[in-house]
């Protein structure tokens, strides 16, 4: 137990500064890191599916997972009308995937399930994280890099502090389970604590940090961001628990010492990042 905790602390001590550094750099280095995380997460989803008798098209999915963040960054910085070509590219990729599944697998190889999991894996593990790109590289990011760095870190920090608050309140007060079948350690009191913690930290960070580096969030907007992040982060956590329960495993992989896999570490962020990007877009921030 002690050695596992030491590994977790050591990994966090290295990973957090690296993550902040990559976010500060932005650009292609940031897109490449997202592509790598997308491929690793996609691979873990495929491994979970394979435990249930579904054999995804690995290479096809990995290529798509790597391409999504790279194309998202290219499109963000391009003045061309990229949306229509992207739709054609997506349709072509789907058709190629289905053709490969049909000819390589045949009816006995469950081609429909293989294609469905192949598509889901890369969209879930890569496309959802790619919403960090429009946050980090918003309209005026070139002139205000520090402001956009803080904006990108904002939902991430809310998530981590909310998760810590949920754990602390759950341990302290206990009570009825939130999702006893999927995540037996989570309690309703912890869920409430995590939600309130997310709202409080969103307001505090928004007023004391974001609004001092160039943003102008109203208190009600910060409450909305904190509330939404406080809810969807817990939903994302439980969703990943569902995947693992279905596959009969404790962790999505053993890639990260003391932490499990990429899915285990980023589970909440798959829901938080697109939700935050949508709210920032709604508020006219990005």
Spans of features found by a protein language model:
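Membrane-embedded alpha-helical bundles of polytopic integral membrane proteins
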Residues: 1-227
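Hydrophobic alpha-helical transmembrane segments of integral membrane proteins
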Residues: 13-14, 253, 270-271
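Membrane-embedded alpha-helical segments of transport systems
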Residues: 162-165, 192, 263-273
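Re-entrant/interfacial helical elements at transmembrane boundaries that shape
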Residues: 170-172, 242-247, 270, 274-275
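Transmembrane alpha-helix interface/packing and boundary motifs in multi-pass membrane proteins
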Residues: 228-233, 268
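Interfacial loop-to-transmembrane junctions
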Residues: 245-268
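Juxtamembrane boundary at the C-terminal end of a transmembrane helix
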Residues: 278-286
């Amino acid at each position: 137990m002690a050695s596992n905790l030491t590994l977790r602390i050591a990994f966090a001590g290295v990973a957090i500064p690296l993550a902040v550094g990559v976010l500060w750099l932005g650009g292609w280095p940031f897109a490449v890191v997202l592509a790598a995380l997308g491929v690793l997460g996609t691979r873990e989803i495929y491994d979970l599916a394979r435990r249930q008798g579904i054999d995804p098209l690995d290479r096809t999915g990995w290529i798509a997972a790597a391409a999504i963040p790279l194309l998202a960054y290219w499109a963000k910085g391009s003045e061309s009308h990229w949306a229509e070509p992207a739709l054609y590219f997506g349709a072509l990729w789907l058709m190629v995937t289905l053709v490969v599944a049909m000819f390589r697998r045949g009816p006995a190889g469950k081609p429909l399930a293989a294609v469905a999991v192949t598509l889901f894996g890369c969209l879930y593990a890569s496309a959802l994280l790619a919403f960090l790109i429009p946050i980090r590289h918003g309209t005026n990011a070139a002139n205000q890099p520090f402001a956009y760095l803080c904006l990108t870190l904002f939902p991430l920090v809310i998530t981590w502090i909310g998760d810590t608050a949920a754990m602390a309140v759950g341990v302290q007060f206990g009570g009825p389970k939130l999702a006893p079948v999927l995540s037996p350690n989570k309690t309703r009191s912890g869920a409430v604590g995590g939600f309130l913690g997310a709202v409080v930290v969103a307001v505090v960070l928004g007023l004391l940090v974001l609004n001092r580096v160039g943003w102008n969030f109203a208190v009600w907007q910060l409450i909305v961001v904190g509330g939404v992040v406080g809810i969807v982060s817990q939903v994302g956590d439980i969703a990943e628990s569902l995947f693992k329960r279905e596959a009969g495993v404790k962790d999505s992989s053993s890639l990260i010492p003391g932490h499990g896999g990429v899915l285990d570490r980023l589970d909440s962020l798959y829901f938080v990042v697109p939700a935050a990007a949508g709210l920032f877009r709604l508020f006219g921030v990005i």
